[in-house]
Curated annotation (Swiss-Prot):
It comes from the Eukaryota. Belongs to the DnaJ family. DNAJB12/DNAJB14 subfamily. This is DnaJ homolog subfamily B member 12. Residues 1-243 are cytoplasmic. The modification Pros-methylhistidine is found at residue 185. Changing residue 138 to Q: Abolishes interaction with HSPA8/Hsc70. Methylated at His-185 by METTL9. One of its GO terms (biological process) is protein-containing complex assembly. Its main location: endoplasmic reticulum. Acts as a co-chaperone with HSPA8/Hsc70; required to promote protein folding and trafficking, prevent aggregation of client proteins, and promote unfolded proteins to endoplasmic reticulum-associated degradation (ERAD) pathway. Acts by determining HSPA8/Hsc70's ATPase and polypeptide-binding activities. Can also act independently of HSPA8/Hsc70: together with DNAJB14, acts as a chaperone that promotes maturation of potassium channels KCND2 and KCNH2 by stabilizing nascent channel subunits and assembling them into tetramers. Residues 45-92 are annotated as: Disordered.
Length: 375
């Protein structure tokens, strides 16, 4: 089965190059062979995509650079598109299918429709939809007028719907700003009321091997892990209410701030950190007895924690360390898988080999720790 998988990967690579060379028949032939050798949803989706094209095999010869629908002027100058884009996008060739795809995104009424998923879509469904569409509309791949804005809209849709809080607000209140924009300017306004906490390019890089941005990160506070979203408060259109109305709107926020402040006062911070933190006095290096995890403590730690209390602290240190490893392992796997997927899609052999050589040190260390725990 493993040999079939390798052969299937080879067929996929050939098929992707054929797609780039505008040879759909050849691409379809190798994709079908790959699906017979090692069936995968990705290959099936590519086959369906090729089969859905209006031109069927044998109707006309494969397009070349001279017959490809580039939508250029004969004199070599580029006509600006309906949304004002000229030069950058329209100097390169694009197909009628790409133009139609951009038009479809422009006409979508909500984020679910942009991604092509139902309102009950799971996180995995959202990831699959974004992964497929982001590659299809990325400015490096799609040069049709409006493709860049469509790419941004897809990124914003995923960023909002993948954030539980933003998705809840979006489902509850809809997108009033975008509706107003559509009534005023017609379809095709990508600037919607809900904003993403991450740029479309950063999101794309996070999925396909360009690293993880700092705007949406895992934060370790006092040795404990939590996930933070940088949430922006939506501006209200209806301003000018009386002072009482403003107070009523601000009251939930004031209560939340008060409760948070009281919580911070009532909860004591852990007596250790996983890295040096001079600001809280955690500068003295120690190592746990069981797993040998390095942690840092304050001046009076040795006096305050001995015997069973010390064992409890070190158990917490190791739990935090393992949680940290799991998180970093997940990110390393996502980065590697994203780069492999991108390399296969674009038929980039160098990128594929580079992705294969990428290490996952956190995953390796996690395996060692788990072996020690169960050994």
């Amino acid at each position: 089965m493993e040999s079939n998988k390798d052969e299937a990967e080879r067929c996929i690579s050939i098929a992707l190059k054929a797609i780039q060379s505008n040879q759909p028949d050849r691409a379809l032939r190798f994709l079908e062979k790959a699906q017979r050798l090692y069936p995968t949803p990705r290959v099936r989706a590519l086959i369906e995509s090729l089969n859905q094209k209006p031109q069927t095999a044998g109707d006309q010869p494969p397009p070349t650079d001279t017959t490809h629908a580039t939508h250029r002027k004969a004199g070599g100058t580029d006509a600006p598109s309906a949304n004002g884009e000229a030069g950058g996008e329209s100097t390169k060739g694009y197909t009628a299918e790409q133009v139609a795809a951009v038009k479809r995104v422009k006409q979508c009424k909500d984020y679910y429709e942009i991604l092509g998923v139902s309102r009950g879509a799971s996180d995995e469904d959202l990831k699959k939809a974004y992964r497929r569409l982001a590659l299809k509309f990325h400015p490096d791949k799609n040069h049709a007028p409006g493709a860049t804005e469509a790419f941004k809209a897809i990124g914003t849709a995923y960023a909002v719907l993948s954030n539980p809080e933003k998705r809840k607000q979006y489902d509850q209140f809809g997108d009033d700003k975008s509706q107003a924009a559509r009534h005023g300017h017609g379809h095709g306004d990508f600037h919607r009321g809900f904003e993403a906490d991450i740029s479309p390019e950063d999101l794309f890089n996070m999925f396909f091997g360009g690293g993880f941005p700092s705007s949406n990160v895992h934060v370790y506070s006092n040795g404990r892990m939590r996930y933070t979203y940088q949430q922006r408060q939506d501006r209200r259109d209806n301003q000018g209410d009386g002072g009482l109305g403003v107070f009523v709107q601000l009251m939930p926020i004031l209560i939340l701030i008060l409760v948070s402040a009281l919580s911070q006062l009532m909860v004591s911070s852990p007596p250790y950190s996983l890295s040096p933190r001079p600001s809280v006095g955690h500068i003295h290096r120690r190592v746990t007895d069981h797993l040998g995890v390095v942690y840092y403590v304050g001046d009076t730690f040795s006096e305050e924690y001995t015997g069973s209390s010390l064992k409890t602290v070190e158990r917490n240190v190791e739990d935090d360390y393992i949680a940290n490893l799991r998180n970093n392992c997940w990110k390393e796997k996502q980065q590697k898988e994203g780069l492999l997927y991108r390399a296969r899609y674009f038929g980039d052999t160098d990128m594929y080999h580079r992705a294969q050589k990428m290490g996952t040190p956190s995953c390796s260390r996690l395996s060692e720790v788990q072996a020690s725990l169960h050994g």
